[in-house]
Amino acid sequence: MGTKLSVSLEGASTPETAPRVDRPPTFDPQYGFERPRKVREMKATWEEMEQWKLKPAQRDYCAHHLISLMKCQTQNAPFAGHACDGERGAWDKCEYDDHIMRIKEFERERRLLQRQARKEATA
């Protein structure tokens, strides 16, 4: 529950080792991995997202699941709540997995910045 507060306090006390969330990662995404990591790709096109009028916050790697949920809801209205459980579950799981992946990337960046600071301090 206090993650946001602890991250912001850590960023204020040691800004050189706190990752910036408004900028791309400073380290190579493949650094430290034996095999290359799979590059994430958008499955929904910009045209589909425009057609379904997705908000900017909804245009993420899970947009294709949201579009299929919205299609199901329009086809099964007014009983879409029960008919679209599978699509809703797929979208929720994708959003959860995306959130976990972003947290892991943030933690990886933070640890690499701390490691870099330790190396510079000893050199």
UniProtKB/Swiss-Prot annotation:
The organism's place on the tree of life at top rank: Eukaryota
Motif placement: Cx9C motif 2: 84-94
InterPro entries: NDUB7 (IPR008698)
Compartments reported by the entry: Mitochondrion; Mitochondrion inner membrane; Mitochondrion intermembrane space
Membrane topology type: Peripheral membrane protein
UniProt region (Disordered), positions on chain: 1-32
Coiled coil: none
Pfam families (UniProt xref): NDUF_B7 (PF05676)
S-S bonds: 62-94, 72-84
Keyword Oxidoreductase on entry: no
Nucleotidyltransferase is among the record's keywords: no
Domain named CHCH: residues: 59-102
Signal sequence extent: none
GO CC annotations on file: mitochondrial inner membrane; mitochondrial intermembrane space; respiratory chain complex I
PROSITE patterns attached to this UniProt entry: CHCH
Entry text on domains: Contains two C-X9-C motifs that are predicted to form a helix-coil-helix structure, permitting the formation of intramolecular disulfide bonds.
Function: Accessory subunit of the mitochondrial membrane respiratory chain NADH dehydrogenase (Complex I), that is believed not to be involved in catalysis. Complex I functions in the transfer of electrons from NADH to the respiratory chain. The immediate electron acceptor for the enzyme is believed to be ubiquinone.
Protein family (similarity comment): Belongs to the complex I NDUFB7 subunit family.
Protein name: NADH dehydrogenase [ubiquinone] 1 beta subcomplex subunit 7
